């Protein structure tokens, strides 16, 4: 077979084989590099199949599609899986609202909570919400890409009770949750 080239829907393959004898194998003549996209990472894999084309000695076209050597199915696409890493980090801040300006917390005054959500993983996280046992947290993040930070979506206000004043502080912890693409 002569004039062998490879076409691939994801990449431009460089190289050519001028001629390949029956039974011969050439694994060094072609190369291609594919850059993984965020959509690939979110999907959990890249699926791809290339086609080799050439001409037999009679001038007839000869083609074959690539095969994933890890399966028994002939001429199937090669799947490169990724391990998803869906992680988010939550930071919670508080601001005491001293409405009577006496410098002390009084029952009926409020604490405003701010929340910072960071996607520290490798996949896009969707439907992010925050729960807090002390307050109702308003807001929801539809999607947050890897490395993304949101500091404006969520907020909550807590009204200080006399028990809080007597205790000298208010302590609680919030939890952020979301859904990975899989």
In which residue ranges do the predicted regions lie?
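Exported/extracytosolic protein signature
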Residues: 1-182
């Amino acid at each position: 077979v002569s004039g062998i080239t490879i076409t691939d829907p994801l990449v431009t393959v460089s190289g050519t084989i001028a001629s390949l004898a029956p039974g011969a194998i050439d694994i060094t003549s072609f190369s291609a590099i594919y850059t993984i996209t965020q959509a690939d990472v979110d999907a959990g894999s890249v699926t791809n199949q290339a086609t080799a084309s050439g001409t037999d000695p009679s001038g007839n076209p000869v083609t074959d599609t690539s095969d994933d050597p890890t399966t028994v199915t002939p001429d199937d696409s090669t799947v490169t899986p990724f391990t998803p890493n869906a992680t988010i980090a939550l930071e919670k801040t508080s601001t005491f609202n001293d409405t009577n300006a006496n410098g002390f917390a009084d029952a009926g005054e409020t604490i405003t909570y701010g929340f910072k959500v960071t996607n520290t993983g490798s996949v896009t996280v969707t439907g992010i919400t925050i729960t807090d046992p002390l307050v109702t947290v308003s807001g929801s993040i539809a999607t947050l890409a890897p490395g993304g930070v949101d500091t404006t979506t969520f907020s909550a206000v807590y009204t200080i009770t006399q028990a809080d004043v007597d205790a000298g502080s208010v302590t609680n912890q919030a939890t952020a949750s979301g859904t990975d693409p899989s």
